Amino acid sequence: MTILFLTMVISYFSCMKAAPMKEANVRGQGSLAYPGMRTHGTLESVNGPKVGSRGLTSSLADTVEHVIEELLDEDQKVRPSEENNKDADMYTSRVMLSSQVPLEPPLLFLLEEYKNYLDAANMSMRVRRHSDPARRGELSVCDSISEWVTAADKKTAVDMSGGTVTVLEKVPVSKGQLKQYFYETKCNPMGYTKEGCRGIDKRHWDSQCRTTQSYVRALTMDSKKRIGWRFIRIDTSCVCTLTIKRGR
């Protein structure tokens, strides 16, 4: 976003060299403007009245200020719609179409880690040490593992109507085919919590780490051989379930 904004501003200033800017709030039909940006002045012709260097500098400064204000206003208008689609973005972030196995987690997970890094960078060294989960002795209640899997590993899945559908391994595109990859998170069968959740009082509770699922969109084929994009369930987390012990 920052690079795009700087590019637009530089291009905008290069156009200013062709003719001086007249400070006015009147827009003519022949005024130049970039898409999504409203101009606050009109460009006079080359043969028009001249403007001093000080006036031109002031005009350019005012223009930059107006552009920044408008971009911030547009950003505030877009954010509410982004918040409404947050759930859908999280669902679809675990699916990727690629010609090879992805080497990193989904972008949403990387952005979350980057945000945590920025938050930690703004802390003092002392606060940062105390906020480190490892230093505070924090451990996950259940051990989990995350990995990319293909349709060849899944083969079938359950859609939102409860029916079993076949997950297609490859998706046709204009230049060939791409494989569907799913980023799944499940309980680690080799972890230390395979016999119960960590930190639970076993005298009063029976605990178990269980893998839970969420819906993601994938290319599938139903029992009637109809191919289409459907929401299917995949493993997305490992949670702790508790049951109270009876007879005590």
From Swiss-Prot:
* This protein's UniProt keywords: Cleavage on pair of basic residues, Disulfide bond, Glycoprotein, Growth factor, Secreted, Signal
List, alphabetically, the InterPro entries matched: Brain-der_neurotrophic_factor, Cystine-knot_cytokine, Nerve_growth_factor-like, Nerve_growth_factor-rel, Nerve_growth_factor_CS
Modified how: Mature BDNF is produced by proteolytic removal of the propeptide, catalyzed by a FURIN family member. In addition, the precursor form is proteolytically cleaved within the propeptide, but this is not an obligatory intermediate for the production of mature BDNF. Can be converted into mature BDNF by plasmin (PLG).
Name the glycosylated positions. Answer: N122
What's a GO cellular component annotated to this UniProt protein? extracellular space
Q: Which GO terms describe its biological process?
A: cell surface receptor protein tyrosine kinase signaling pathway; modulation of chemical synaptic transmission; negative regulation of neuron apoptotic process; nerve development; nerve growth factor signaling pathway; neuron projection morphogenesis
**Could you say which residues are annotated as the site Cleavage?**
T57, S58
Show the propeptide residue ranges. 19-129
Q: Where in the cell is it found?
A: Secreted
Q: Name one Pfam family in it.
A: NGF
Q: Single GO molecular-function term?
A: nerve growth factor receptor binding
- Superkingdom assignment: Eukaryota
Q: Signal sequence span per UniProt?
A: 1-18
Q: List the disulfide bonds.
A: C142-C209, C187-C238, C197-C240
Q: What quaternary arrangement does the UniProt entry report? A: Monomers and homodimers. Binds to NTRK2/TRKB. Can form heterodimers with other neurotrophin family members, such as NTF3 and NTF4 (in vitro), but the physiological relevance of this is not clear. BDNF precursor form: interacts with the heterodimer formed by NGFR and SORCS2. Mature BDNF has much lower affinity for the heterodimer formed by NGFR and SORCS2.
Function noted in UniProt: Important signaling molecule that activates signaling cascades downstream of NTRK2. During development, promotes the survival and differentiation of selected neuronal populations of the peripheral and central nervous systems. Participates in axonal growth, pathfinding and in the modulation of dendritic growth and morphology. Major regulator of synaptic transmission and plasticity at adult synapses in many regions of the CNS.
The entry's family comment says:
Belongs to the NGF-beta family.
Its protein name is: Neurotrophic factor BDNF precursor form
Q: Which gene encodes it?
A: BDNF
